[in-house]
Amino acid sequence: MSQNQETRGFQSEVKQLLQLMIHSLYSNKEIFLRELISNASDAADKLRFKALSNPALYEGDGDLRVRVSFDADKGTITISDNGIGMTREQVIDHLGTIAKSGTKEFLTALGQDQAKNSQLIGQFGVGFYSAFIVADKVTVKTRAAGEEADKAVLWESAGEGEYSVADIEKKSRGTDVILHLCEDEKEFLNEWRLREIIGKYSDHIGLPVEMLTKEYDDEGKECGEKWEKINKSDALWTRSKNDVSDEEYKAFYKHLSHDFADPVTWAHNKVEGNQAYTSLLYVPAKAPWDLFNREHKHGLKLYVQRVFIMDDAEQFMPNYLRFMRGLIDSNDLPLNVSREILQDNKITAALRKALTKRSLQMLEKLAKDDAEKYLQFWKEFGLVLKEGPTEDFANKETVAKLLRFASTHNDGSEQAVSLEDYILRMKEGQKAIYYITADSYVAAKNSPHLELFNKKGIEVLLLSDRIDEWMLSYLTEFDGKQLQSITKADLDLGDLADKESETQKQQDEAFGSFIERVKNLLGERVKTVRLTHNLTDTPAVVSTDNDQMTTQMAKLFAAAGQPVPEVKYTFELNPEHHLVKKVADIADETEFADWVELLLEQAMLAERGSLENPAAFIKRINKLLG
């Protein structure tokens, strides 16, 4: 008999997610069983952990398991566990709302592409709500460990706008999830179909999955029923990697991550000695929707002596490897370990160092063995990996080898060139790795600063991600070669520089008074004015000194709301260009000023992508064209 019944409305995000799931995951509908068994496994893990300090929570029943049964006449499937269970408050919190930061942004990001929706929802972790893919009504009966039998809770919903919650009596600890299947989903009311799904997705979770099966006598007559364990229920990571197939590794990854796609690669290692631990690390194929959400925890599952301790233990991986999935099982950490203890712990620091090294080795091997697959990985996670040089000095060179860039060597914008590739193609006498940063690939590719390099056939890396400038402030050299921006006023080409010709000397002398006129006109608005022989098709450019903040870094600071120091540019004019020659011959000071301002504005526009006063620029063009 239920008491204290109330009807409540779903959080708006839940309603939206339910509708998206029902329409987007139809082709993957069997995952409902994987998700519900995974939830049951989590409930068992949480009970084991809490019972370490309070064994009475087992209530005399320490054999944890999940049971799957069906009733063909009633059209129901029941998934039962004897794990931690839930209180009334927890039921409302967990089943009526989605307590995930960034949920609204995630739902907004979903478009009409069903394949994309399916993938994104899988990454989000649909969990309990996947039940509504196959059921038109879901009933949950649950009692939290340690609570009295009359403190159990009944939750019911048809997956629409609301749900009901009431108090009931339940003798056994744990949770029963009863699915009332839709009329066209009766295929799941079949023992062998359910066995197939459990074998596919849940064979290697560390919890026995049992099904109620019929027993037959010697004459083949049905004589009863019994609970039969139908999965291996061993902790896959405890087995020798030689005994685990690729398909088993892939299935375990999907259980662990709730991902639909296979991982790109994985590494399973057992380490003995001063520190004994086992790690199973995976590189996903697709970036999760919340990869750049700083509020969301990203990390490994932590086990101590095969006992689950916590999800998302971020202390074992640097932030730039937050896309890694997997687990670590340590023999050296205490069973009562907490996030606070992990924060300042020598064992944690040593494990983090080892797991970071192992992860980078996985990526190095992938890049070496399958360049195409690595480039697919790079498209998904390259932006995150670029954070590496800014936060991991010890592994900076290793991370640098894994970076990929667009380059003038290739036609397209694909980031496919490594620093090692670049060095192999360097010109004889070239001492630096040259690069340019810009707002976009197109802006970088068409920068006037490239003209001399294109003329000489010197490769330049084209960088257009927002993080690039920040990364390069830490990554200043690679393999003994300096990384040098080609937009700097004091650019040194070393042995590749042209010897100053007699013609250039004559030009410097002939344009001397012109340069002084420009300096006097612009005054403090620029750092200095000078001639340049590094341009071919462009009349003028602006550049910064080595000790000055670059344009892109200034933009980065401004976007982050940080104070930006004033950037004073060097204004460089091309004496070979017909416009510069024309301006140099203008005697009228007003006309001369208009043309100089126009050349400066053009140069600033090419460098910064915008002007402080675009209206004045347009007015000046119209005036000079008229």
UniProtKB/Swiss-Prot annotation:
InterPro entries: HATPase_C_sf (IPR036890), Heat_shock_protein_90_CS (IPR019805), HSP90_C (IPR037196), Hsp90_fam (IPR001404), Hsp90_N (IPR020575), Ribosomal_Su5_D2-typ_SF (IPR020568). Pfam families: HATPase_c_3, HSP90. Residues 1-339 are annotated as: A. It comes from the Bacteria. Residues 556-626 are annotated as: C. Homodimer. This is Chaperone protein HtpG. The gene is htpG.
